[in-house]
């Protein structure tokens, strides 16, 4: 097996173009960007006024099968496909989420793509970037401080301190902060109460920023966020505290999309970063809308498999944005299919055709899901260096035999050149296949019916069960008139079910909803299932242990 440069070595050897040159490539005027050094910029929201009459480009969504813990290269395929579209003469922008420091320091070590299909400068993007994550964290924690101060100063709204639902946030994995007590140390420090932290990317403010259309919509959404309940059970919002203006002020720059570039010097918008297993899992609507005004094709991704990010993209993001995806790319890998066929994680580099063939059932279910939405699709078989020709052909052959458009993808090793077959196939299905896009549920459906339709159609479950706590919350949501919102299921990414141990295509199972939480500002109801947590913990050997910086300031260990 030939040796390859690491992701960070490729990134650091790439000569970046000035970001002003990337902007000119998209016909962005100089006064419409705000530069952060030479290689990063924010795009002014004023650009929409100039481009409002321009037709939108087509949105291509990249999703995947249920992944292994290491991921299946979906971000890499997303970047590589956008580069490949340029190589076949199509004007494209890749629109991605910003990485969270939690997974970067924890398991993943970075999330800017890989190999010769990365967004750059990857060190900046994976760490502090343009400060968006910190602004969102600050806004989240400012709101928490405003709530406690309101209570300390007399509690005019009669907030029940046992029913404060707004948590503090931190953009790191820190299990010790899941459950905390604040207000200790005497009367001067406020009222003692139970509290806790969510990771920033699970904060409702992250979702609000990513679904807002503009600053006015952002402020409206911030005002409507439910932060607590009164002693008689009435919801208390951020607007009732009168702080939506201050929160919007903290976010006035964070709402602007970030312009960067790929390894091949093609444009990229990297903005917003909600997780898909505990939030809606898509980049900001503003970035997607901006990209659609600037290019003929927008290649974007939704977190984890089609059961999580893609389902939420369809039901939440497209509804908020009023657009229809042009096509979907479903990323599949030999190693993940072998895992779903029963190969232990430690043995995934070993050839196992029988396990691979069994695991294809997982891919089949995700294809069924995208087909249920009525969208054209292509299976991207993402090649890893250890894959054998027999294994790759087994997947491609199954796709051919069953009438599923598919292409081998080698963008990690070859950049855009390794994705031109995929790019041509995607263009082909958009031009030749009918787009029959429709939702799986209507907003007028009950919460129970929305969850049942997702569970049966997307997960393959027999139905949905509710804990006693969730049943009480159902009644509260209906009483408060929130049952007309879409639902956002918080679920494990490793299985179609709510049990991460049920690999492949599980049968004879139900989804159990243990808690329902309104995110009224974001515009959806979060349904928590299984043991999913909104503040992750670090693994035994965090990726941070391999990270360093040399005397010249050069980063090491990111990938």
Curated annotation (Swiss-Prot):
The keyword Transit peptide does not apply. Pfam families: FTHFS (PF01268). ATP binds at residues 68-75. One of its GO terms (biological process) is tetrahydrofolate interconversion. It catalyses: (6S)-5,6,7,8-tetrahydrofolate + formate + ATP = (6R)-10-formyltetrahydrofolate + ADP + phosphate. GO terms for molecular function: ATP binding; formate-tetrahydrofolate ligase activity. InterPro entries: Formate_THF_ligase (IPR000559), Formate_THF_ligase_CS (IPR020628), P-loop_NTPase (IPR027417). Pathway: One-carbon metabolism; tetrahydrofolate interconversion. Belongs to the formate--tetrahydrofolate ligase family. This is Formate--tetrahydrofolate ligase. It comes from Bacillus licheniformis (strain ATCC 14580 / DSM 13 / JCM 2505 / CCUG 7422 / NBRC 12200 / NCIMB 9375 / NCTC 10341 / NRRL NRS-1264 / Gibson 46).
């Amino acid at each position: 097996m030939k040796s390859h440069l690491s992701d960070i070595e490729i990134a650091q050897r790439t000569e970046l173009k000035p970001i002003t040159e990337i902007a000119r490539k998209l016909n962005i005027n100089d006064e419409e960007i705000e530069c952060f050094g030479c290689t990063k910029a924010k795009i002014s929201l004023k650009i929409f006024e100039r481009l409002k009459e321009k037709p939108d480009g087509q949105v291509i969504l990249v999703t995947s099968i249920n992944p292994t813990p290491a991921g299946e290269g979906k971000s890499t395929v997303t970047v590589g496909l956008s580069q490949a579209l340029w190589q076949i003469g199509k004007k494209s922008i890749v629109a991605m989420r910003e990485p969270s420091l939690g997974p970067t320091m924890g398991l993943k070590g970075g999330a800017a793509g890989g190999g010769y299909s990365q967004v750059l400068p990857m060190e900046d993007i994976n760490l502090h970037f343009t400060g968006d994550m910190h602004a969102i964290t600050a806004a989240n924690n400012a709101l928490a401080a405003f709530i406690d101060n309101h209570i300390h100063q007399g509690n005019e709204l009669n907030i029940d301190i046992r029913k404060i639902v707004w948590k503090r946030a931190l953009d790191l994995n820190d299990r010790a902060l899941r459950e905390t007590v604040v207000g200790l140390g005497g009367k001067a420090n406020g009222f003692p109460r139970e509290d806790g932290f969510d990771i920033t990317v699970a904060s409702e403010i992250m979702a609000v920023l990513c679904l807002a259309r503009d600053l006015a919509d952002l402020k409206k959404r911030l005002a409507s966020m439910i932060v607590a309940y009164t002693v008689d059970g009435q919801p208390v919002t951020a607007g009732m505290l009168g702080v939506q203006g201050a929160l919007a002020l903290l976010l006035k720059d964070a709402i602007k999309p970030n312009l960067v570039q790929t390894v091949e010097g093609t444009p990229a918008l990297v903005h917003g970063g909600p997780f898909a297993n505990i939030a809606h899992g898509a980049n900001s609507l503003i970035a997607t809308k901006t990209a659609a005004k600037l290019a003929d094709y927008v290649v974007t991704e939704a977190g984890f498999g089609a059961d999580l990010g893609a389902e939420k993209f369809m039901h939440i993001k497209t509804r908020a944005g009023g657009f229809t995806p042009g096509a979907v790319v479903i990323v599949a890998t030999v190693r993940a299919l072998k895992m779903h066929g029963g190969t232990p994680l430690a043995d995934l580099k070993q050839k196992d055709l029988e396990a691979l063939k069994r695991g294809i059932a997982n891919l089949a279910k995700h294809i069924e899901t995208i087909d249920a939405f009525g969208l054209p699709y292509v299976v991207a078989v993402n090649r890893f260096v250890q894959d054998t020709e027999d294994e790759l052909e087994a997947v491609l052959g199954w796709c051919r035999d069953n009438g599923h458009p598919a292409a081998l993808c080698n963008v990690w090793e070859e950049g855009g050149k390794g994705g031109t077959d995929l790019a041509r196939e995607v263009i082909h299905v958009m031009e030749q296949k009918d787009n029959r896009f429709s939702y799986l549920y209507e907003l007028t459906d009950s919460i129970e019916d929305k969850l049942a339709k997702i569970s049966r159609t997307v997960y393959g479950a027999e139905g949905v069960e509710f804990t006693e706590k969730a049943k009480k919350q159902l009644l509260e949501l209906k009483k408060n008139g929130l049952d007309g919102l879409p639902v956002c299921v918080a679920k494990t990414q490793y299985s179609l079910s709510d049990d991460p141990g049920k690999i492949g295509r599980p049968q004879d199972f139900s989804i159990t909803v243990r808690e329902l939480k309104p995110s009224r500002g974001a515009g959806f109801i979060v349904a928590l299932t299984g043991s999913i947590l909104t503040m992750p913990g670090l693994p035994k050997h965090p990726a941070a242990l391999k990270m360093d910086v040399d005397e010249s300031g050069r980063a090491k260990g990111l990938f």
